[in-house]
Design a protein with these regions (language model features):
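Soluble periplasmic/extracytoplasmic beta-strand elements of cell-envelope proteins
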Residues: 1-2, 26, 43-47, 104-106, ...
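Small/polar-residue-rich segments within soluble enzyme cores
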Residues: 1-99
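Serine endopeptidase catalytic core focused on the charge-relay Asp
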Residues: 13, 59, 108-122, 245, ...
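Envelope-exposed proteins and targeting segments
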Residues: 23, 38-43, 76, 99-103, ...
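Conserved, well-ordered alpha-helix/loop/beta-strand core segments that scaffold catalytic motifs
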Residues: 88-131
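Flexible, solvent-exposed loop/hinge segments and secondary-structure transition points
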Residues: 21, 52, 119-129, 135-137, ...
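Beta-lactam-recognizing serine transpeptidase/beta-lactamase-like catalytic domain environment
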Residues: 81-94, 133-178, 183-361
Length: 361
C-alpha cells in the first residue's frame, strides 16, 4: 500500500490496521521529493522522477548535482552457514546509510519572489512566447534571482509541457542587438582609439558600407562617442569599430566572455556563436559591434555586463554558494572567482559607466 499522506497519519493508520487482524495488507515506506515553493525557481532546481523505486534526476541542479545529493543505502555483509544464519565468528562488514549532501544557493528568496512576480506581469501585458530575467551581483558573479516563462510546478506532473523544462537562460541564444554597443565602445576607449568626446558623422541615419545600407532609428549628424551610446547609433558604433580594427574587436568580444560557456551548473549550456576571425566578411566589423551576426545566451550577456559594471574583472557566475555534508558537517565553499581587469586604461571603467548612465538620465 502506498500513502502520500502525512507521516504521523500514516503510522496511525498502519497501527490501526495491524491491530484489526486483517491479513494480506503490507506496508512499505517510500520517499518522494517535495518542492514546497512550487513554481518558484522551478527550472533552476529541476526535479526528479521515480523509476522502479529509484530516484532519477531529470533537469536543473537536481541533475547536475545528482551524485552529490543522492543518499546511500546501508549494507551489512556477513558469512553465513548452510542454514543462512550468520556465523558467530565470521567476518562482518557494515556500511551505514547516509543522506545526500545539501546545496545552499546564491539565490535571495525575497528578490526571487519579486522577480517572478514582475515576470508574470510582463507575460500578462505583452504575451510573449517566452521570457526570462536574471539579477546578479557584478562583483562576485552571484546569481541572486533568476526566472523564466513558461515554467511549471514540479509537484504536479500531469500535462507538464517538456518545453517548459528547458533552462532557456543557458540554452537559448539570440542576436544581442544594441546590448553589444557598450561592449564594443569600452574596448575602443580602452585601446585609446577614441575618447568620450571623439566625434563621428552619423550620416543622417543612412550609411553605405561594403555595398550594404546601415540605418539608424532616426537621422543624426555629428555625435560624440558618449552621444552615440546615449542615442544608440548603429552607424556611430560601426565607425568606432572600424577605428578599432577587426582583430581588436574580436579580442574585445572574447575578453567579455562571448563565444564561450559561463560554466554555471546547468546542462546543456550553449557557448553562443562568435565566428572565428578568419571567417569574418567585410560587413562583420560593422555588424558585430551592434549585436548583429553573433548570438549569445542570457547568461553570457549577464556575465559581460558584470564585467562592465565591476571595472573590467571577469567573474564566474555562481548559483551554488556551498555544499554541506549533514553527517560530518564538512562544508565545501564554491569560491568566488574574480580575475584581474581586462582594461589597460584605468579611466575606461568610469568613462563607460558615465555613458551608460546618460542613457537613462
Amino acid at each position: 500500500m502506498r500513502s502520500s499522506s502525512d507521516f504521523d497519519e500514516f503510522e496511525r493508520l498502519k497501527l490501526k490496521i495491524s491491530k484489526s487482524g486483517f491479513k494480506g495488507i503490507y506496508f512499505r515506506n517510500s520517499f518522494k521529493r517535495n518542492y514546497p515553493k512550487n513554481e518558484l525557481l522551478a527550472n533552476i532546481l529541476g526535479f526528479t522522477n521515480l523509476d522502479r523505486d529509484r530516484v532519477v534526476a531529470v533537469i536543473g541542479l537536481e541533475k547536475f548535482y545528482d551524485r552529490n545529493m543522492t543518499s546511500g543505502k546501508g549494507e551489512t555483509r556477513f558469512e553465513r552457514s548452510r542454514d543462512g544464519l550468520p556465523l558467530a565468528f565470521g567476518n562482518i562488514s557494515r556500511e551505514e546509510a547516509h543522506d545526500g549532501l545539501n546545496l545552499y544557493l546564491t539565490i535571495r528568496e525575497p528578490l526571487q519572489a519579486i522577480l517572478e512576480e514582475e515576470l508574470d506581469k510582463l507575460m500578462e501585458v505583452n504575451k510573449p512566447t517566452a521570457a526570462y530575467a536574471i539579477m546578479a551581483d557584478p562583483y562576485t558573479g552571484d546569481i541572486i534571482a533568476v526566472a523564466q516563462r513558461p515554467t511549471f510546478n514540479p509537484n504536479i506532473r500531469e500535462n507538464m509541457n517538456p518545453q517548459a523544462w528547458r533552462n532557456r537562460i543557458a540554452e537559448d541564444i539570440f542576436e544581442p542587438g544594441s546590448i553589444m554597443k557598450p561592449i564594443a565602445v569600452a574596448g575602443a576607449i580602452d585601446l585609446g582609439v577614441v575618447t568620450p568626446e571623439t566625434r563621428f558623422d552619423c550620416e543622417r541615419g543612412r550609411w553605405f558600407y561594403g555595398g550594404k545600407l546601415l540605418r539608424d532609428s532616426h537621422p543624426m549628424g555629428l555625435l560624440t562617442v558618449s552621444e552615440i551610446i546615449q542615442h544608440s547609433s548603429n552607424i556611430g558604433t560601426a565607425k568606432i569599430a572600424l577605428m578599432m580594427g577587426a582583430r581588436q574587436l574580436d579580442s574585445t568580444l572574447r575578453a567579455f566572455g562571448y563565444g564561450k560557456k559561463t560554466g554555471v551548473p546547468l546542462k546543456p549550456e550553449t557557448a553562443g556563436i562568435v565566428r572565428p576571425l578568419h571567417r569574418w566578411d567585410k560587413l562583420s566589423i560593422t555588424r558585430f559591434p551592434i549585436g548583429q551576426g553573433i548570438a549569445a545566451s542570457p547568461l553570457q550577456i549577464v556575465r559581460s555586463y558584470c564585467i562592465l559594471a565591476n571595472g573590467g574583472h571577469p567573474v564566474n557566475l555562481r548559483l551554488v554558494d556551498r555544499i554541506e555534508n549533514p553527517a560530518t558537517g564538512k562544508v565545501e565553499k564554491i569560491p568566488v572567482v574574480r580575475q584581474p581587469s581586462i582594461y589597460r586604461n584605468k579611466n575606461t571603467h568610469r568613462a563607460i559607466i558615465e555613458m551608460m548612465k546618460s542613457v537613462t538620465e
